[in-house]
Each structure stands twice: as structure tokens, then as C-alpha cells.
């Protein structure tokens, strides 16, 4: 998959290098524990547990050969539009995606407002959810696959480029994502 890149700075030291195929799944697994502790078991898996519980997860690593890593740093093209995506707005769009079973998310500028829209762009009679999240004098529609927006729920400064790439910069943690837009995005 070459449409998402995440970068984070962490203070923890890791015993060994490992690959995770589905990072959102791994993060959700870690979040199941109040005070998670990771124990690396050789080179094939990690045990996630909490000192105050009897539960644990044995989580297997991916083969490093299936992970696509960038060979050079990403240079974000000039932004066409920028806005702040608040955690509450992000949480609501995620709930709408799940509740209405919608595969697409659009960031839409109508010349006045910026809306976040959960939709099925291939089905004109599908249910839609929309919410005004900002203002812009620009007209555009930037499409994402909903599955590509599995990022840490938080506040983000978002930049979108006409070259069909976006940059999500977490406002509270040293985490950022570059997520490709869908080819039918319009500027």
C-alpha cells in the first residue's frame, strides 16, 4: 500500500526492529489496556499486557518484505487549502462512516465553507453525512477512501495539495501522516 505514510517520534526504546502490517489494528490492541506493557518475544511477536489485569494479547509481526517504506523524505507540494480538523469532528465522521457503512470521505469547499462529508461516491442514492468544519473561498472536492483515515483520533492541522496528497499534522503529539487523495478529486 503506497497511499499512507505515518511518522511519529516516541520516547520509548525498542529492543528490536519489527514490522506491523495494520498499524491502526495494533494501536487499537494497545489501547485495550489501561497501562500497556510490551514484551518482545524473539523476532516473531510481542505480548501486550497490563500489570493490573489478567488479559494479554499475543500480536504477530508482519514479514518485513510486505512493508513498503519510502526511500526518501516526502516534500509536500504547495498547499491549495488548509484547515484544522478537531478531534470531535473527526470522531463524528468516523461514527458516520461506521453507522451508515460509507466507503468514502470528501473534504468539500463550496466557495464559502469547508465540509467534511461521509459518502459513497459510486452510489448517488446512498446516505450521506456532512458537517461544516471551516471556511474557505475555494471550490474543491478532495476524496479519501474512508479506510485510509484510520489515524489517531486527535486535533490536526490539515493541508491539501492540488497534486492529490494531504498532510495531517497532529496538534498535540509528534505524529504526522501523508495520505493520498483519490484520483477523481477536483480542484
Can you say where each PLM-predicted feature lies in the sequence?
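Long, charge-dense
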Residues: 64-83
Amino acid at each position: 500500500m503506497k497511499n499512507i505514510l505515518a511518522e511519529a517520534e516516541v520516547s520509548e526504546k525498542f529492543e528490536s526492529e519489527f514490522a506491523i502490517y495494520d498499524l491502526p489494528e495494533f494501536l487499537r490492541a494497545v489501547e485495550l489496556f489501561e497501562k500497556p506493557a510490551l514484551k518482545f518475544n524473539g523476532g516473531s511477536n510481542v505480548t501486550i499486557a497490563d500489570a493490573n489485569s489478567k488479559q494479554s494479547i499475543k500480536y504477530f509481526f508482519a514479514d518485513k518484505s510486505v512493508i513498503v517504506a519510502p526511500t526518501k523524505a516526502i516534500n509536500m507540494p504547495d498547499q491549495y487549502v488548509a484547515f484544522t480538523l478537531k478531534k470531535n469532528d473527526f470522531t463524528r465522521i468516523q461514527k458516520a462512516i461506521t453507522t451508515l457503512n460509507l466507503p468514502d470521505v470528501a473534504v468539500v469547499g463550496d466557495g464559502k465553507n469547508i465540509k467534511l462529508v461521509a459518502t459513497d461516491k459510486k452510489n448517488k442514492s446512498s446516505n450521506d453525512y456532512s458537517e461544516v468544519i471551516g471556511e474557505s473561498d475555494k471550490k474543491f472536492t478532495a476524496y479519501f477512501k474512508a479506510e485510509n483515515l484510520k489515524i489517531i483520533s486527535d486535533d490536526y492541522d490539515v493541508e491539501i495539495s492540488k497534486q492529490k496528497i494531504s498532510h495531517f499534522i497532529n496538534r498535540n503529539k509528534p505524529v504526522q501522516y501523508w495520505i493520498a487523495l483519490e484520483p477523481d478529486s477536483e480542484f
